[in-house]
Amino acid sequence: MEIKVLAKRKVSAKRANEILGKFILERKANEENRLFLSGNATPTEDLFQIVSNSLNKFQNHLNESINPELALTENNNNNNTTNGDSSDEALIPMSDDQPNPLKDSSNTLQIDDGDVSERYSDSVSSSTTTTIITNNKKINNNNNNKSKDIDSSNSTESENEKSVQKSKKEKESPKKLTKSKKSKKQESSDESSSESSSSSSSSSSSESSSSESESSSSSEDEKKKKKKKSSSTSSKKSSSKKRKVESSDDSDSSSSEEEKKKKKKKK
């Protein structure tokens, strides 16, 4: 709800502040007004009535500040009326020199030289309040339905997630078993391979040792043979030398005898 002030006469700033201060205090004095100002109250017909009464009081303050004589006459007229609804709405006397109050398409209250003209009547305001209430109910119902839908979707999603997790676990459990079996088989195969490798290494070492022993024995045999050969050759050489010496001695002796014989013959 908007308020527009259209004034031809100037009001002092001090007086305007006093008027606004009184208006604010009167609005805050009521609990419903205070809740409405703080934004914690829902709009109702009583609340709109209280706000309109507050606006009427604001109009009276402006009338007193701008034209005290008109304010007195309006107060007298308001006191003479017997209808409660007419007492809530102030009578607005319009003179010839005053312009007509402006009206907008929106639900606004306009002030022209301290006079308040309301765009809509009480019936329109009551219809607007009922539409607002119905709209609020619809909004609340929609919000409740949305929250229910969200809760149901969340529950279905959680159930789906649980089922997916269960299926994953069921799928993973045989895989884990097969993996464990495979790992055990691999361990056993590794152990057997290590045993075979150790046996092969031991056999190879034994073979190498046997080959070494054979080679050493063969080398010793060869050495012995060589020694035998060398000894035999040396013995042969010595025997041949002896024979040569003996033959030479024999030859010498024979030659000496022949010479002796020759000499004897000559004699």
Curated annotation (Swiss-Prot):
Residues 122-145, 194-218 have a biased composition (Low complexity). Residues 159-175 have a biased composition (Basic and acidic residues). It comes from the Eukaryota. Residues 72-267 are annotated as: Disordered. This is Uncharacterized protein DDB_G0280579. It comes from Dictyostelium discoideum.
